[in-house]
């Protein structure tokens, strides 16, 4: 998606350890025009798959997921990283490792919001090692829900995440695919 690639080039910063900082439009401040365009692109790609819900992880996956949900007219469910007094039992849970935070988190979704009747689209902000998406797939499996597709905002194609997700047989679509972050230069793969 050219618009997203332009935002990444103009406003993204490469940090040590192959970390891409996109706080200016996705991970801290949100650009709603870009989010709407991304949501529409995800909807266009997955519109014929019978999606009944979109599932993501708090917090940076929420904005693109909501705009995709709006475009597809379906609810969005986000996995919580921390339990609260209102989210304590009747949960589907998985443990995921965060590449950027270098820590594991238990993520949870209430059984009330995900069932075997659902056909879901997983949306995540980044694909690096694939652990977040795999955790959401595990939650869907616990619920008996069908995962029809995985939408990724930014994929670091030089890491193993895509390879792991491809092994699931579920269609994966990334809006921007990064080939390299070497020498603080952002190089993209061609669009899918």
From Swiss-Prot:
Converts the preformed base xanthine, a product of nucleic acid breakdown, to xanthosine 5'-monophosphate (XMP), so it can be reused for RNA or DNA synthesis. GO terms for molecular function: xanthine phosphoribosyltransferase activity. This is Xanthine phosphoribosyltransferase. It comes from Listeria monocytogenes serovar 1/2a (strain ATCC BAA-679 / EGD-e). The lineage of its organism: Bacteria, Bacillati, Bacillota, Bacilli, Bacillales. The keyword Cytoplasm applies. Xanthine binds at residues 20, 27, 156. It catalyses: XMP + diphosphate = xanthine + 5-phospho-alpha-D-ribose 1-diphosphate. Its main location: cytoplasm. It is found in: Cytoplasm. Homodimer. The gene is xpt.
């Amino acid at each position: 998606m050219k618009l997203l690639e332009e935002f990444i080039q103009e406003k993204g910063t490469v940090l040590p350890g192959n970390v891409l900082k996109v706080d200016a439009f996705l991970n801290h401040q949100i650009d709603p025009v870009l989010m709407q365009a991304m949501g529409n692109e995800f909807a266009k790609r997955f519109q014929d798959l019978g999606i009944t819900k979109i599932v993501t992880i708090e917090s940076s996956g929420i904005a693109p997921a909501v705009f995709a949900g709006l475009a597809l007219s379906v609810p969005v469910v986000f996995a919580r990283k921390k339990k609260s007094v209102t989210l304590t039992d009747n949960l589907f849970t998985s443990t995921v490792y965060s590449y950027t935070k270098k820590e594991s988190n238990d993520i949870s979704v209430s059984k009330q919001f995900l069932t075997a009747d659902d056909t879901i689209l997983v949306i995540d902000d980044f694909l690096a090692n694939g652990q977040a998406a795999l955790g959401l797939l595990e939650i869907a499996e616990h619920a008996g829900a069908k995962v029809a597709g995985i939408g990724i905002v930014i994929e670091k194609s030089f890491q193993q995440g895509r390879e792991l997700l491809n092994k699931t047989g579920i269609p994966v679509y990334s809006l921007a695919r990064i080939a390299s972050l070497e020498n603080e230069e952002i190089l993209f793969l061609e669009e899918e």
